[in-house]
Amino acid sequence: MEPIRILVSYKDSIQNYETALRAVGAEPVSQYLPGVDTSYDGLLLSGGGDIDPAYYGEGLEGSVRIDMDRDAAEYALMKAYLEAGKPIFGICRGHQLINVYFGGSLVQHMPETDQHRNGDDPPAVHRVTAEADSILGRLYGTDFLVNSYHHQVVKSLGHQLRPTASWNGRYVEAFEHPTLPVFGVQWHPEKDQGDARRLGVVDGLPMFQYFVDLCRKYRDG
């Protein structure tokens, strides 16, 4: 059986993403500013700096580490993979990029007093509530702990995206598209996988397994 090949778009650290994908039998191909190439079985949009707020009609109000070349490259990849009908998985920044692509917007900087956000390592850990009939609900149940590395979050949800997990009923932590093989999570499942995860935090590997199985389903029909 041919391995599932995943294009991973990234800028900074890539090791944890590659480790997770290999652990579930996939072959990751990691690139910074990849050209449009839909020969891969799926697209993983990884974490990183903030998206230029001009993409959702706002000026700079707290966004940092903007990489306009990366924004443009990943927008082009999103368009191509959607047109090709291939699965897309967004993590943290990738989750936010999917939301913006579908017409949503972001809170550019969460309040410093909000214990939910934490840009440091070790990260904050908090509970999320998931919809029972969602990807996450089927994998983990409706109540579980995740890590938190981000300082931005979904403000308005993109068109047709279905919110499937939230923190305290306030912030969207995950979504999925009802008809397209597209989903995203705000936390970093690759940072808590297998035996390396923090006590009580959900294991990220089942999510990567789901993504790879989805890619195989779409590839093999």
Question: At which residue positions do the language-model features occur?
Answer:
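N-terminal beta1-alpha1 cap of cysteine-dependent amidohydrolase-like domains
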Residues: 1-93, 100-101, 107, 111-139, ...
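Short catalytic/ligand-gating loop segments at beta-alpha or beta-beta junctions
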Residues: 146-151, 175
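Short, surface-exposed beta-strand/loop micro-motifs that present aromatic residues
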Residues: 171-178
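Beta-strand-turn-beta hairpins that frame and shape the catalytic cleft
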Residues: 160, 178-182
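Conserved ATP-binding module of the ATP-grasp superfamily
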Residues: 140, 145
